[in-house]
C-alpha cells in the first residue's frame, strides 16, 4: 500500500535538510513515570505480531529507498559507478515514465481523454518502482550506499517516513499490550479523568477566589492611584516653589559674582605688581646662580680630572696586581702538580713500607718458628742420646751376664754401678 502511494509521487526536485531517525526500539525507550500506561512486555511473543511488524519494517525500508530515487535520477554521474548498470537503467525508465505522467497531469485540457491514458501509465510507474526496489534489494551494498544519502530526501517524503515510524511504534505498543494491561490502562485513564475533573473543580474555585481578590486588589490600586495623584500635585507645588527660590538665589549669586569680579580685578593688579617685583628678583638670582654655576663647573672639571687620574692609576695598579696574581696562580699550579707527584710517591712508599713491614713480620714469624723448631730438635736429640746411652749400658750388662757368673761382690758392684748410671741418665 505504501509503495502504491509513493509510486504516484513526483520525483525529487530540491534537497531537504531532514534526516530519518532510527526505528523505535521498545527495549531502549526511557522509563515512563506513568507505569500503568507502559506495557509490561518489551518483545513480541506471537508469530502474527512478529509478521505484522516485519511487514511494516520492510515497508519502511522500501519507502526509504523509493524516496531516494529522485536523488539518483538527478545525480547519475555520482552514483552510476556504485549502483550498477541494471539499477541505473531501471531508474532511467522510471524517470521517463514519471516525466510522462507529470506532463499528462500538467495538461488541463481534455481531462477525460487524459484519464484513459493516465491509468495504464500509473500502473507502469508502480511496476517500474517495484522493479527498481527488487534490483536494490538484490544488491544490499548499493541499497546501503543509497540510504546514506538521507540529506537528499524531500521534506514530504521525510514526513511520510516519520509518520510510518511513528505508526510502527504505536502498532508495536498495541501488539505487546495484553488484554489485562489494556483494561488496567483504561481503568487508569478513567481514574485520571476523574482526578482531572476534581482538579478542574478546584481550579474553578481558585479562579473565583482569584477574581474576587483581583477586584479587591484593583480597588486598592485605585486608592493608591488617588494617593499618587495627590502626591504628584503636591510635588508640582513644591517644584514651583523651588523654581521661585532658585530664581532668587540666582539673582543674589549674580550680584555676588559682580562684587567678586571687581574685587578680583583689584587683586589681579596687585598680583601683577608682585609678579614684576618677583621677575626682577628672579633675574638677579639667575645672574648670581650663573656665577655660582661657573665656579661649580670649574670645581667639577677639576674633580673629574682627579677622578680620571685616580682611575688610570687604579687600572695600572690593578694590571700589575693581575700579572702578579697570574704568576702566583702559575706557581700555585706548579706546586700543586709537585704536591700531587709527592702524594703519588708517598702513596707508593707507604705501599712499599707496608709490604716490607709485612715481609718482616712474616720473616720474624718464620725465624721464631725456626728457633722453636731448633729447640724441639735439640730436646729430641738429647732424649735420643739418653735413650741410646741407656741402651748401650743395658746391652753391656746383658753381655756380662752371658760370660758367666762372677763374684758376688763384683756383681753387687756392677749392680751398684748400673743403678748409679741409671740415676745419672734420669
From Swiss-Prot:
It is found in: Cytoplasm, Cytoskeleton, Flagellum axoneme. Residues 409-426 have a biased composition (Basic and acidic residues). SMART domains: IQ. The keyword Cytoplasm applies. Residues 399-408 have a biased composition (Basic residues). GO terms for cellular component: ciliary basal body; cytoplasm; motile cilium. Keywords: Cell projection, Cilium, Cytoplasm, Cytoskeleton, Flagellum. InterPro entries: DRC10 (IPR042815), IQ_motif_EF-hand-BS (IPR000048). It comes from the Eukaryota. Its main location: cytoplasm. The keyword Signal does not apply. Residues 18-37, 399-426 are annotated as: Disordered. Residues 377-406 form the IQ domain. PANTHER family: DYNEIN REGULATORY COMPLEX PROTEIN 10, IQ DOMAIN-CONTAINING PROTEIN D. Belongs to the DRC10 family. Component of the nexin-dynein regulatory complex (N-DRC). Interacts with CFAP52. Component of the nexin-dynein regulatory complex (N-DRC), a key regulator of ciliary/flagellar motility which maintains the alignment and integrity of the distal axoneme and regulates microtubule sliding in motile axonemes. This is Dynein regulatory complex protein 10. The gene is IQCD.
Amino acid at each position: 500500500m505504501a509503495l502504491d502511494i509513493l509510486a504516484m509521487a513526483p520525483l525529487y526536485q530540491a534537497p531537504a535538510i531532514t534526516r530519518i531517525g532510527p526505528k523505535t526500539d521498545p527495549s531502549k525507550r526511557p522509563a515512563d513515570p506513568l507505569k500503568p500506561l507502559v506495557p509490561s512486555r518489551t518483545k513480541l511473543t506471537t508469530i502474527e505480531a512478529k509478521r505484522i511488524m516485519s511487514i511494516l519494517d520492510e515497508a519502511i525500508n522500501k519507502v526509504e529507498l523509493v524516496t531516494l530515487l529522485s536523488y539518483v535520477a538527478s545525480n547519475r554521474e555520482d552514483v552510476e559507478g556504485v549502483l550498477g548498470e541494471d539499477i541505473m537503467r531501471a531508474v532511467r525508465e522510471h524517470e521517463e515514465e514519471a516525466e510522462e505522467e507529470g506532463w499528462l497531469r500538467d495538461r488541463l485540457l481534455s481531462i477525460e481523454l487524459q484519464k484513459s491514458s493516465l491509468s495504464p501509465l500509473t500502473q507502469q510507474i508502480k511496476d517500474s518502482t517495484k522493479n527498481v526496489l527488487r534490483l536494490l534489494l538484490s544488491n544490499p551494498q548499493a541499497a546501503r550506499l543509497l540510504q546514506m544519502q538521507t540529506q537528499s530526501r524531500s521534506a514530504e517524503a521525510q514526513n511520510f517516513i516519520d509518520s510510518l515510524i511513528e505508526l510502527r511504534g504505536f502498532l508495536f505498543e498495541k501488539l505487546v499490550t495484553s488484554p489485562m494491561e489494556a483494561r488496567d490502562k483504561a481503568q487508569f485513564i478513567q481514574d485520571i479523568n476523574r482526578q482531572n475533573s476534581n482538579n478542574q473543580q478546584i481550579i474553578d474555585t481558585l479562579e473565583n477566589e482569584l477574581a474576587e481578590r483581583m477586584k479587591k486588589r484593583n480597588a486598592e490600586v485605585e486608592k493608591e492611584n488617588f494617593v499618587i495623584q495627590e502626591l504628584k500635585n503636591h510635588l508640582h507645588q513644591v517644584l514651583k516653589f523651588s523654581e521661585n527660590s532658585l530664581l532668587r538665589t540666582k539673582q543674589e549669586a549674580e550680584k555676588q559674582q559682580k562684587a567678586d569680579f571687581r574685587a578680583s580685578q583689584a587683586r589681579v593688579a596687585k598680583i601683577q605688581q608682585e609678579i614684576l617685583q618677583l621677575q626682577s628678583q628672579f633675574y638677579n638670582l639667575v645672574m648670581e646662580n650663573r656665577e655660582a654655576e661657573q665656579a661649580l663647573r670649574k670645581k667639577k672639571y677639576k674633580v673629574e680630572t682627579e677622578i680620571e687620574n685616580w682611575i688610570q692609576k687604579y687600572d695600572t695598579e690593578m694590571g700589575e696586581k693581575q700579572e702578579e696574581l697570574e704568576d702566583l696562580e702559575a706557581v700555585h699550579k706548579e706546586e700543586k702538580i709537585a704536591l700531587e707527584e709527592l702524594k703519588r710517591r708517598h702513596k707508593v712508599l707507604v705501599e712499599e713500607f707496608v709490604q716490607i713491614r709485612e715481609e718482616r713480620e712474616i720473616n720474624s714469624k718464620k725465624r721464631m718458628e725456626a728457633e722453636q723448631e731448633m729447640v724441639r730438635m735439640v730436646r729430641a736429640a738429647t732424649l735420643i742420646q739418653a735413650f741410646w746411652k741407656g741402651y748401650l749400658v743395658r746391652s753391656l750388662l746383658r753381655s756380662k751376664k752371658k760370660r758367666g757368673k762372677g763374684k758376688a761382690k763384683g756383681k753387687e758392684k756392677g749392680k751398684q754401678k748400673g743403678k748409679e748410671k741409671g740415676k745419672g741418665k734420669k
